[in-house]
Amino acid sequence: MHYAYFYLMSIIKRRYFIRESERKDLFKKFAEKLGVNPEKLFGVKPKIEVIFINKGKIFVINGRPVLMDLEGNLIPTLVFEEIIQKLPKVIVDMGAIPHICNGADIMAPGIVRIGGEFKEGDLALILDEKHGKAIAVARALLSSENIRALKRGKVFENLHYVGDLAWRVIKEETRGK
């Protein structure tokens, strides 16, 4: 076994497959929050495993870690391509990336371009300027219209980013698949 496995054992608190009633509640919340019919994506009766970590829960649906519940907020993981591609895009300059990947919130000066419209509290996908790769999922603290006008200050709360605890668990879950 390699080191990462033992490290992850300390992060993962417990894991189990959820019941039908829990699945219905999760799918209802999923449809409300993300505006997509989950049964079309996953089927009528998918296998859903919940992994409890320090910050919240990761939902592994049909073997793919696609959703997270962080402090009551349901968000897609960075590997859930079907959903994150529908989120508004925010392109940040290369100087902001190390800070974002260390958990920093997104500041107005680091934003190069905003693609799409959103309101305060909506989720957005943070992309790097050079490669266009997804590096974070963040919650808007202001509307897209207001953010475009700002030159300074915090504009997004970083919820899930490349390198966080959830990301490490997700990478280990998808390794070899």
Locate the predicted segments by residue.
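Beta-strand/loop-dominated core regions that host nucleotide or nucleotide-derived cofactor-binding catalytic loops
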Residues: F6-G56, I61-R113, E117-E120, A124-K177
